[in-house]
Swiss-Prot record:
This is N-alpha-acetyltransferase 15, NatA auxiliary subunit. Keywords: Acetylation, Angiogenesis, Cytoplasm, Developmental protein, Differentiation, Disease variant, Intellectual disability, Nucleus, Phosphoprotein, Repeat, TPR repeat, Transcription, Transcription regulation. Disulfide bonds: none annotated. Residues 595-604 have a biased composition (Basic residues). It is linked to Intellectual developmental disorder, autosomal dominant 50, with behavioral abnormalities: A disorder characterized by significantly below average general intellectual functioning associated with impairments in adaptive behavior and manifested during the developmental period. It comes from the Eukaryota. The modification Phosphoserine is found at residues 302, 537, 588, 855-856. Cleaved by caspases during apoptosis, resulting in a stable 35 kDa fragment. Residues 579-642 are annotated as: Disordered. Component of the N-terminal acetyltransferase A complex (also called the NatA complex) composed of NAA10 and NAA15. Within the complex interacts with NAA10. Component of the N-terminal acetyltransferase A (NatA)/HYPK complex at least composed of NAA10, NAA15 and HYPK, which has N-terminal acetyltransferase activity. In complex with NAA10, interacts with HYPK. Component of the N-terminal acetyltransferase E (NatE) complex at least composed of NAA10, NAA15 and NAA50. Within the complex interacts with NAA10; the interaction is required for binding to NAA50. Interacts with NAAT50.
Amino acid sequence: MPAVSLPPKENALFKRILRCYEHKQYRNGLKFCKQILSNPKFAEHGETLAMKGLTLNCLGKKEEAYELVRRGLRNDLKSHVCWHVYGLLQRSDKKYDEAIKCYRNALKWDKDNLQILRDLSLLQIQMRDLEGYRETRYQLLQLRPAQRASWIGYAIAYHLLEDYEMAAKILEEFRKTQQTSPDKVDYEYSELLLYQNQVLREAGLYREALEHLCTYEKQICDKLAVEETKGELLLQLCRLEDAADVYRGLQERNPENWAYYKGLEKALKPANMLERLKIYEEAWTKYPRGLVPRRLPLNFLSGEKFKECLDKFLRMNFSKGCPPVFNTLRSLYKDKEKVAIIEELVVGYETSLKSCRLFNPNDDGKEEPPTTLLWVQYYLAQHYDKIGQPSIALEYINTAIESTPTLIELFLVKAKIYKHAGNIKEAARWMDEAQALDTADRFINSKCAKYMLKANLIKEAEEMCSKFTREGTSAVENLNEMQCMWFQTECAQAYKAMNKFGEALKKCHEIERHFIEITDDQFDFHTYCMRKITLRSYVDLLKLEDVLRQHPFYFKAARIAIEIYLKLHDNPLTDENKEHEADTANMSDKELKKLRNKQRRAQKKAQIEEEKKNAEKEKQQRNQKKKKDDDDEEIGGPKEELIPEKLAKVETPLEEAIKFLTPLKNLVKNKIETHLFAFEIYFRKEKFLLMLQSVKRAFAIDSSHPWLHECMIRLFNTAVCESKDLSDTVRTVLKQEMNRLFGATNPKNFNETFLKRNSDSLPHRLSAAKMVYYLDPSSQKRAIELATTLDESLTNRNLQTCMEVLEALYDGSLGDCKEAAEIYRANCHKLFPYALAFMPPGYEEDMKITVNGDSSAEAEELANEI
């Protein structure tokens, strides 16, 4: 349909529509649209229809908006306004690729439209279409050479494309146009100079970068950045004496910065350990209260010199009462010799302080205050916990608590000792005690909630967090709004442990949405950072966003989700009622009565909680509705609700698992778990070449990893030994690669070789034992013997590995072996007396945990039992 041009009156109204949109006066904009469209001559005016659609989209009426914009576009296909509006609509729905196409169509009809070019450049940088971004920024520079954003955007395009020299030239040309006095300090000009210097450094032009820094030093506001950069550049240019002077100056600014001592070491190049120590001894004299110059030498000293320096360091900290001293020394615990020296010194302090209130009976000087002994005991509790002696650790911390029962840090350490010893429920109880001492401390509150989640006390954890969340909304919803990912990952883990897979997946998907939101949030900074010239931070932001899913929170959520989807594929959820009936069929009358009572109590409790939850939800919905009515600027509709039941009964669990796996394969290639999870998925999909690829990538990271060994045996056995309908090409590739990985052998021999090579490692023995049973179920007895050995000579005979062995005995990885599992549990209980996993049957049922002294539920249950 040919375009209809508006007469002056309607054209003036149309301009008012545009102004209303720009000023977010959407209701007024709709009135003006109605005035134009009510005229029969202009009822189908494309641009007005498009603008009406765009305005409605801003009011949340998405379907109507799309219908109007498409109608407008059909009526005027050659209108840049219609195409631009359609692009804006797609952009609001995060369909950036489609929006880019719309903008390109708009530019066909108005190639020099500044607004469309700017919008296009934003989408290109968002989607990292760097070549396209450079072209668009060049067009903007040609059209508006006087605007600084045009120059800066063009320079950033070259910087991101790693054409540093061109970026530096553009920035220099732009800098020349900036009229600033050499003595005047202007923040934006300062940031421009620092960004220009960063580009020169990344280009490897260190001499030019140093000259640039010295020339414009007076005009740069960030003096610290100038000195730090100068130090790095002088080191790069081997001007070591000058670099040493710079780092000494930086130490005067902040004697507690580790990086300055490292820089000074590089500049002075000490020939031996004594010369290296001399650097720090000078700092002791200069900064007598400095902790870092006393701590860093402990990393490289050994023997008597280490003991001498450590003695001074510990005395200073214990006298002052410095709680984090153990965390400061934690990295030294990799060295057994240093651990022995630490223990000797601190145990000596404790003995001496008890007898004469001095660190050493031969010391001269005034006596130490009683708190010094407290901090020594506090340290010893953490020390023995770290070296795996929880009984001694508990003795020390209990003594400390008896002397000072109001110190929160002591309860925190006691909780940690129980956690590391394997009793997370007792740990949660003690963390709750700590929280009760200071209910206004958010850190303790969060720690307590985290321990409760680890103990699968989800409701209690939610109640704990609710003390610091917004009123009128549920704690869980508010924590999700705040993107509180530590809470959600722990929640997901707890639900997974309780086999509530739907709830766990909901948390994993919520975390996935947070990362999508964080990626989308960068959109606002593309224009803001160029306007404010915060260019260094902006480039760092872009680089961070590119590797965002490397973050541990995402990896943890993805791992939990993949594990659940694999379980759902292996054992799809069935009708729970039928399973429940099968379970109760074998119960005695007394047991059945007890169960029914328990079910009634649980049902009553659930009903009360549901009513409470519904009331909260109604209140929350009222608040949200009010907020929505007040806010006419809301864009887009609500997100799809995550329903646990629906998530747990997904039809294609492996495809869902791949969605979480893909970012890990792209960004977390250095973690072996990424490739082993990939193998587990492709093994179930029978994608042999992808299985092989995963194994090879994992092999390159750690060829002797126990889990990798299991994957290799399964691949070997499935692809080569079992007959499969494989194409000749695939079979040939598999055989060639398998020969490279395994050599001329069979799975059994390969497993035996692996076992001989790693016979002193418990995790490796467990993997080999699983494969012994997998390859030959008749060898079950040998497999169990291999896995359940608890010799002291074995490496990694720790709590975690022993729990994995017990799980393998229960889950069928070593066949049906309940008797062997019970014997192994009893043996492990002697080794790890505090661990819940190895407690006698019925122990957990007898153990009750109350949160902040609330034992009403326990009393009610006891009454019902009677």
